[in-house]
Amino acid sequence: MNRRRLGNSPLTVSDICMGTMTFGTQCDEKCAFEIMDRAYDAGIDFYDAAEMYPVPPSAELFGRTEEIVGRWLKTKPRESLIIATKITGPAHGWFVPPVRHGHSALDRVQIMRAVEDSLRRLQTDYIDLYQTHWPDHGARYEDVLEP
């Protein structure tokens, strides 16, 4: 498996990132473990999840994919994997994400809450790559980044 540097970071990742958005709905935990094991055995070390997965999103299933990935992570050396996950920002129009009890703003409080929740579901003490699923056009990023 070829590898490349992840942006300007010191991380190197497999050329292929294993997406997990259907784990917990279309693909049960047994199926998900089989897929992730085969990917791992093929040299894929880069796995992507999100707090709102699986799809289609629902309040009942919110976070299930991260839970499945977290249980699978316990079967592998954590340092051998690059784990990416995402925070869901506020959507517009017909879809309201069932996240954080309806609090989907990307302010400092919600970002910290989402990170802690993802760490718990993933059963790890760090996330290698944390991204936003949707931007929050109302967020003042200067306020978010201030300690």
Task: Put a short name on every predicted segment.
Residues 68-72, 86, 110, 114-117:
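Generic beta-strand or strand-like secondary-structure segments
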Residues 21-23, 52, 86-90, 132-135:
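Active-site beta-loop-alpha junctions enriched in small/polar residues
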Residues 25, 54-56, 91-93, 138-139:
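Short catalytic/ligand-binding loop motif for oxyanion handling, primarily in non-cytosolic enzymes
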Residues 94-147:
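Glycine/proline-rich, positively charged
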Residues 46-50, 82-86, 126-131:
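Short beta-strand segments at enzyme active-site cores
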Residues 1-81:
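N-terminal binding-site loop/beta-alpha segment at the start of enzyme catalytic domains
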Residues 52-53, 75-104:
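Structural motif corresponding to the early beta-alpha repeats
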